[in-house]
Amino acid sequence: MKIEKPPYFEELEIENYLESILDKNVKLFFQEVDKRYFYWTEIKHRPNQPYASPQQTWKMLKAHRLVQAKQLFLGNHPFHFCVTSFIQQDLHNFDLKLIGGLYKDSISTQEQQEYLKSSLLEEAIASSQIEGAATTTDVAKEMIKSGRKPRNESEQMIINNFRAIQEIENRLDEDMSVNLILDIHEIMTVKTGAAKYAGEFRNHPIYVKDHIDGEIAFTAPDSSEINPLIEDLLNFINREDEFYHPIIKASILHFMIGYIHPFGDGNGRTARALFYWYLIKKGYSLLKHISISRAILDSRTSYDKAFLKTENDNNDLTYFIMYSMKSLRVALQSLVTYRDKKREEKQKAAEISYELTLKGFNKRQADLLGYLSVKPEATVTVPIYSERNGIVRQTATRDLAELVKKGMLRKQKVGKTVVYELVDNT
């Protein structure tokens, strides 16, 4: 994949920009462009430009961005990024949802745990699929839930990702370090072809190929630069004397692992795991309930373009920061959808339970039938029913037997266990 490089200017006309920005139409144009942080190819064909040519518009836009940009140096590699008012607004919204408690008073602890397990699986599977794991999502979930051993390298990659995500929970009190990077990478690559690269940074050149056409998309820094680049990255991530929003820092961390490419293989998986680690460490615990890699997998071309735009446009990290925030937004929406679904299910179950109590069922029986009506695939046993309702097993057995007699439940044996399931009366 190749994208057109923008025009390069030796000098930017800052004074001309500062004069022109006083014009209302120019100011409105830049505000509109800031919303989506347009790249050169989007500016090039944009109608109603306030300058004489697309090239002049781009030159003034570069001046506009330079004036508000924050600078970052890793070794001899200069980077910069802009925190526009629109990015600030998005960050505020993320804070309200990711720290403010999207789950609060909405779904039960058990449902949260169910979704957490599902999200961990999704993240492990999707992160591996981005790197080429061929195993389907359903097969991968079956493997992890059943505990069976992986049958091929694709399945091993998924197991490794799952274990790495779990390991992150144990490392939240640590600062970012070389050991943390090496440990996460080693877990990610065990028993795969990339295992030979574990435990140390590469000592050979790396040419990153495009996942679609196989062409060289990027040449990573020379191996002699890796240690100083990583050291500067660690300093940036760990320092607290200058505040950068955690989502911005995590996005830059994600990008830089991909840019430095410190390992012979497994860089992308490691970068995404460290993105998670940093944000959870900084208090965004709800992030454990969403899968960023699933959002990335579903927009892989945009993911690659975000890297290329950054590199093509004088290492402007804003493109990748914007992409990270969009992926977070998409992933978060999945959680919102799940929460809303659970609310609807609880409301429906409560309505059914109320109607059944009016028909003579006791509250325990009515609640069970209400629950099973929205979870028809679920089953219940005497011990579980007894424990949930705080009653002795004799009473639990009588309740369930009455429901069987009334044709509401079906009793059957699964192995040595007696289970009760809802009778489909549709």
Per-region residue spans from a language model:
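FIC/Doc superfamily catalytic core
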Residues: M1-D265, R269-T426
